[in-house]
């Protein structure tokens, strides 16, 4: 919040562009993260209770007077799960695949955040503060490498690789059932472990950074060309022809 209104150059295609604020750039990611978290939270996992091939065969053979679909739905819902009215031997895991896909999307936003912070550090727009006893670089004492953001990016990439493997596998099972998804699902814990490691790295890295206010404002003051968008808009408003070329 302290630096949320700090004006700074924006960069499109790596070149100075119409200005932004530090707070605006962070709020972009806050907005995106919330968007994907809301989608993830909205997805309820499903359950089924309709027998070995999903047809209530044994249920009806044992007791024909019971409405097994209604009873099964009541039982599944009592476990906090949404009821799957259609399945094979297994619950078809489309909801799980949808949740994994949204988790993949969220991870991409976090990777984008880690890379943007990395770039701002490389421009010296953000400074990293070392704690006592920390080493910034193994051989170059003048450096403070952005290892927390690099670690987060790497671990999120591994998590995304596992998500793709899981998502692609769990939606496919031969006829009424095969076990090829079983060994894949054993990796779901590893997947979320990589995400947790990444989140901890991001939290650690964010705690170290602060803006280099002097350099940010100096670069902004030396980049008057970024006003051309605003100037040409005013010229167009006032009917000046070919304003883009004239400003260029």
Predicted features along the sequence, with ranges:
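Glycine-rich cofactor/substrate-binding loops
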Residues: 124-125, 138-248
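Charge-rich, acidic-biased intrinsically disordered regions
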Residues: 3-25, 49-64, 126-141, 178-184, ...
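Long, hydrophobic, amphipathic alpha-helical segments used as structural scaffolds
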Residues: 1-7, 11, 37, 41-44, ...
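Long, non-coiled-coil amphipathic alpha-helical linker/lever segments
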Residues: 1-17, 79-95, 175-179
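Internal glycine-rich alpha/beta core junctions
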Residues: 18-169
